[in-house]
Amino acid sequence: MSPATITLLFLLFAIVMFVWEKIPLGVTSMIICVGLVVTGVLDFKTAFAGFIDSNVILFVAMFIVGGALFETGMANKIGGIVTHFAKTERQLIIAIMVIVGLMSGVLSNTGTAAVLIPVVIGIAARSGYSRSRLLMPLVFAAAMGGNLSLIGAPGNLIAQSVMEEMDMSFSFFEYAKVGLPILICGIIYFAFIGYKFLPDKSGEKDSSYDEQKDFSNVPKWKQALSLIILVLTLLGMIFEEQIGIKLCITGCIGALALILTGVISEKNALKSIDLKTIFLFGGTLSLASALQTTGAGEDIAKTVIGVLGENPSPYVLTFVVFMLCCILTNFMSNTATTALMAPICVSIAQGMG
C-alpha cells in the first residue's frame, strides 16, 4: 500500500472519529500521529514536530495569560461592569454581545463564555429576565468574537501553522478584517431582529452555573496586574515586526511574568492549559504533513478541481469550500474541521496556481 493511500485512510479515519466522537478528539489525533510513524509514512521527528510548533507554544502561553484573568476574577468584573449600565433587556443583550465578542478576540472564546455564563445568569436572576434569552446571544458572540485575532480560537492558529509551512502567515489582527464585520452584523441583527426569536423558557432549573465564584478575597493588585500584563502582551503581539520578538515568545514573557509576580500560581497556570486542544493541534499537524509529503493532498485537490470542471472560478471554489466547512462543523468541532480542511484547502489553492 502506498504512503498516499495510507494517508487517505488515516484522513477517512479522522473524519469518522471526529464526527462520531466516541473517543476524545485529542486521542484520535494521537492515534493518527503514532499510526503515521508505525506505518512508515512519516519519521518520528516529522510526525511529532507539531508539538514544538511555535503556535503550540503560543497556545500554552495564552492559556496561562487568559487563565490569570479568569482566576483573579478580572474577567468576571469586566463583564459585570459593562452589563451594569444596561437598563432594558435589549440593551443587556447588546452589552453582553459587545463585551463577550471583544473578550473572545483576545482570550479563549470557550473560556470567556464559561466565565461569563454565571455572570449573565446572576444578572438574569436580579433583573427578572429569562436566562435563556441572554445566554444564546452570549454563545453567538463568543463564536463570532473568536475571529477577531490570531489567538481568538484554536482553529485560527491551526490555519496559521499550515500557512507557515508555505512561508506565509497572518498578522495578529488580520482575521478581524472578516471577523469584526461579522461580529458587528451579528450584534445589529440581535439588537433589531434576533431578540424577537430568542427562546423564553420558564421554570428553568438550577445548574452548576448558578453558583457564582467569590473573588472578594483576591487582592486588587492581582486583578489589576493580570489586566496590565494581558494588555502589554497583546501590544507586544500587535507590534511584533517593530520590536522583533515572535508572538510565541511575547506570550511566554507574559505567562512567566504572571507566575513570577504571583498573580497566578504554577499549579493554576498548568490547570489553565487545555491539553485536549494541544493534543488535537499537534496530532493533526502530522496528518497535514503527511497529506503534503505523500501527495495525497494534491490528489484530493485534483479530484475537487476535476469535479468542478476545467479552470473553475476561484469564487465558485471558495463557495464550495465554505459550504463544505459549514456542513462539517455541524457534525464535528470547529477546531477539528479546521484541522482537516486547512491542508486540503492549501493543496487546492496550489493546484489552481
Give residue ranges: language-model regions.
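Short, structured coil/loop segments at alpha-helix boundaries
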Residues: 1-2, 73, 88, 156, ...
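Juxtamembrane and boundary regions of transmembrane helices in multi-pass small-molecule transporters
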Residues: 6, 127-140, 146-158, 162-216, ...
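Membrane-embedded alpha-helical segments and adjacent helix-loop junctions characteristic
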Residues: 27, 34, 38-130, 272-277, ...
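Transmembrane alpha-helix interface/packing and boundary motifs in multi-pass membrane proteins
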Residues: 14-23, 99-109, 140-151, 236-242, ...
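Short, electropositive, low-hydrophobicity segments enriched in small/polar residues
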Residues: 25, 44, 70, 149-150, ...
